[in-house]
């Protein structure tokens, strides 16, 4: 009888422990939840801390605050970072450009566009890159104007990169004109802008538009053009995948430049595996 009683008591103890474990799993403690993710109040506190740092007299501290706000990837943090767009320091204004991106394109694009006319080259360049990261077609007109009119090659290159990041077909004509003017004019002033030309060629490939093939083939086929640009054109043609590019790519595959030859062969395999 005693043995039966002990067995029954053991059985009840097991049931009790099992029920307790299930309760803990179904209802985790507040401390356990706090380990999983920061509380709302902690996030708000951190945003407020960085907001206060934006009032510092030290430009480096203000820039660091913007970097931290941007790294939070929250709209509330990016909204606080908006004030940095009008900071007296170019370094801070440039840092604010990417810090506001968590607002989404509807808010960030209108906020960034004025910075593309900033007197400081670095600010214009960073705002162009940031506009590209919005992936918004609403930024194309501004970026196109920047590509065509800015006096600094670094800014124009950033605009071309940004147009590629957006990847909208509406930018093909402008990008093609940038590339073909250099491809058809030989030793022209534009040929010196190697980063602009490379960025334009790559951006054309990112649009995936067959309308870009003519300009890219012209660049690839022009032996007077800088090899880096021709290689980028070869790669872009592979990204588009139009068989119309195969003759030019096959010619480039026999180039004495091993890197151009390799890029052309890779694109040929992509188009005609």
Predicted feature locations:
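Amphipathic alpha-helical scaffolding segments comprising HEAT/armadillo-like alpha-solenoid repeats
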Residues: 40-53, 74-86, 105-117, 136-148, ...
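C-terminal segment of classical bacterial N-terminal signal peptides
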Residues: 17-28
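Short inter-helical turns and helix N-cap capping residues of alpha-solenoid HEAT/ARM repeat scaffolds
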Residues: 57-58, 88-89, 119-120, 151-152, ...
């Amino acid at each position: 009888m005693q043995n039966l009683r002990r067995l029954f008591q053991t059985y009840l103890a097991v049931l009790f422990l099992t029920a307790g474990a299930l309760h803990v799993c179904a209802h985790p403690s507040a401390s356990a939840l706090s380990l999983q993710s920061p509380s709302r109040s902690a996030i708000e506190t951190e945003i407020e801390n960085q907001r206060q740092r934006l009032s510092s007299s030290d430009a480096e501290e203000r820039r660091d605050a913007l970097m931290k706000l941007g790294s939070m990837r929250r709209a509330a943090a990016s909204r606080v970072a908006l004030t940095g767009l009008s900071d007296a320091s170019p370094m801070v204004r440039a840092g604010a450009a990417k810090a506001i991106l968590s607002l989404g394109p509807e808010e960030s694009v209108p906020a960034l566009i004025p910075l593309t006319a900033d007197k400081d080259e670095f600010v214009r360049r960073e705002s162009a890159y940031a506009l590209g990261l919005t992936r918004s077609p609403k930024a194309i007109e501004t970026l196109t104007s920047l590509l065509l009119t800015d006096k600094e090659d670094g800014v124009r290159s950033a605009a071309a990169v940004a147009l590629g990041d957006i990847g909208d077909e509406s930018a093909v004509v402008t990008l093609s004109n940038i590339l073909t003017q250099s491809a058809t004019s030989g030793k022209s002033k534009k040929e010196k802008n190697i980063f602009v030309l490379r960025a334009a060629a790559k951006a054309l490939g990112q649009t995936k538009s067959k309308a870009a093939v003519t300009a890219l083939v012209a660049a690839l086929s022009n032996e007077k053009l800088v090899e880096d640009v021709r290689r980028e054109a070869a790669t872009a043609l592979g990204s588009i995948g139009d068989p119309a590019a195969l003759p030019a790519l096959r010619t480039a595959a026999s180039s004495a430049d091993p890197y151009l030859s390799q890029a052309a062969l890779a694109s040929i395999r992509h188009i005609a595996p």
